Every structure is written in structure tokens, then in C-alpha cells.
Amino acid sequence: MDDRDLLEIIRPVCGSDTCSDDCAILTLPCGALVTSTDMLHERSDFPAGMTGWQIGWMSVAVTISDIAAMGAEPLQIVLAIGLDTEERLAEIVLGAQACCDTYGAVYAGGDLDAHSELTIVSTGVGIIRDGEPVRRGGAKPGDIICVTGTLGRAILGLTGDSRFWKDLCEPQPRVREGTVARLAGAHAMMDISDGLAISLYDIAAESHVGMEISSGRIPLPPEADVQVALEAALYGGGDFELLFFISEEKMKNLTIPVTQIGRVSEGLKITMDGMELPKKGYLHHW
């Protein structure tokens, strides 16, 4: 089983409406708060060679990326850190603070404990002051499928290409882009940290639609081998870019550079270049 299978155990308890997005939502009279939490382990999430500062940065960035995917502004981060050795703490919290400072969030402490493996749980709160969050369930047939940035960089760094090592270790959440997409009228959005393919399937499942994308339109690093980079972009994960869906009419409202990779279709099939796209991505398995 993988983490998406296990989510089906949680849905009946919490309710599908609260378990279907990058963040949980608390509606306010004048906007909304969004919250997300992420658990990272050294063996599975922090590659050998990462500095403590980069570990702290990444631990915060993954949560801020979830907040960005709702079109929200990050407010506050708390970290629960299970330390394997106390000497690592100072560098980790400096990296965490740097990421918070970069994206306008407050690092507000958290919890400390001893642990045999370095484990960090990051919890974040974001706010939308002027509207509603963008969820995963709003994609409509005819919508244009858009992504920010270039994809595949993180896995290229993980597999030995030093040109992309920083992309892997110091992800840059797309907070501004998420807000712009929300204000432009995006119908659905999520981050693609688990890979583009599985993210398309996640949106399709919540929106009850199909999708048609073109491999030639997926933005890849020009300096990398095309096929290797395409595989990394589709299935590798680690790219904290945004995937969103917007009508052709509302595309003119966007003030950020994005790439159009396809369209939403009727039915439930997802295809790339006319062939069914494998449902694969970065998953935790039990």
C-alpha cells in the first residue's frame, strides 16, 4: 500500500472534503486560514551531502509550498524536531529561519525530542485575506493545464548531476505565483512535489475530469538530456512547482510566466501524446 491508499482509511473519519487538498481550510468571516503539516525523515528525505542549513530550509519549504498551492500567504511555521545528535540543531534552525524570512512567515518555535533518526515535522499556517482558497476539485473540461518553472531538476540533482543539486536541497516555493493564479481565477491547483503525472491524477480524481497533455510542451531544463529530464519531471518528484487549471478566457489575467501543457477533457482518462499516461510518482510504501 502507498500513502494515497492509506488516505482512504482517513477520509471516512475526517470527511473527504477536508482530506483532498494540499492544506486544510478554516473559513473566516473575512477570508480563510489554511494549515498543512509535513513529516520528513533523514533516510528518505534528506540525501547524503545536504547541510544542516539545507535540511532546515527544505523542512520549511515543503510546507510553504502546500500553502502556496492554495493561493495563500504563509504566516507562521512551527517545527517538531527529533534530533539524533544535538550538534545539528543550530544549523537546522538557521536554515528554517532563512526560509521563513524569504517567504514572509514567522518561525515560531515548536518541539524538540531525541530520536534515533533525524525527523522533522513542519506545520504551517497561511492566510487568504481577499477570497477563497484554490482547491483540487474545480478543474473543468476545456480548462488549460499550466505549470510554473521547469520540471525534473530535483531528480536530476539527486541522481548525480551537480548542476541541479541546489534545486533538490533548496526548493523555492511558488508563493507569488500561487496568489497570482488564484486572483486570475484558477479553478484548481496543487504543487507537484510528488511528480507531474501523479499530480494530474490527483486533480482528475477530485474534479472528475480527464486530461490531455503533450510531452513536447512540458518545460524541462534545456541543458539536460530530454528523455531523462522528462522521466524525472513526470514521475520523480521533488519539484516544488505549481500545477493549475484555468479557462482560456482568464489566461489573460495571469501576470506570471507559465507553460501551457494541455487541456482538461471530458471523461476520466489522462493521456500524453494520445497514449494513456502511467499513474506513477513519488509515493511512500508499506
UniProtKB/Swiss-Prot annotation:
What superkingdom does the record give?
Answer: Archaea
The cysteines covalently paired via disulfide bonds are none
Pathway per its UniProt entry is: Cofactor biosynthesis; thiamine diphosphate biosynthesis; thiamine diphosphate from thiamine phosphate: step 1/1
Q: Entry's InterPro entries?
A: PurM-like_C_sf, PurM-like_N, PurM-like_N_sf, ThiL-like
Residues where Mg(2+) 5 binds: D194
Q: What EC number(s) does this enzyme carry?
A: 2.7.4.16
Per UniProt, where does Mg(2+) 4 bind?
Answer: D22, S36, D66
Sorted alphabetically, which keywords does the UniProt record give? ATP-binding, Kinase, Magnesium, Metal-binding, Nucleotide-binding, Thiamine biosynthesis, Transferase
Positions binding Mg(2+) 1 in this chain are T37, D38, D111
Q: Does Metal-binding show up as a keyword for this record?
A: yes
Q: Which reaction does it catalyse?
A: thiamine phosphate + ATP = thiamine diphosphate + ADP
* Residues the entry annotates as binding substrate: D45, Y282
Q: Looking at the keywords, is Ion transport present?
A: no
The transmembrane segments are none
Residues that bind Mg(2+) 3: D22, D66, D191
Offer one Pfam family short name for this entry: AIRS
- Give me the residues that bind Mg(2+) 2, please: D38, D66
- Which residues of the sequence carry a binding annotation for ATP? G110, D111, R136, S193
Protein role: Catalyzes the ATP-dependent phosphorylation of thiamine-monophosphate (TMP) to form thiamine-pyrophosphate (TPP), the active form of vitamin B1.
Q: Which PANTHER family match?
A: THIAMINE-MONOPHOSPHATE KINASE
Which family does the entry's similarity section mention?
Belongs to the thiamine-monophosphate kinase family.
The miscellaneous comment for this protein is: Reaction mechanism of ThiL seems to utilize a direct, inline transfer of the gamma-phosphate of ATP to TMP rather than a phosphorylated enzyme intermediate.
According to UniProt, the name of this protein is Thiamine-monophosphate kinase
Which species expresses this protein natively?
A: Methanospirillum hungatei JF-1 (strain ATCC 27890 / DSM 864 / NBRC 100397 / JF-1)
The encoding gene: thiL
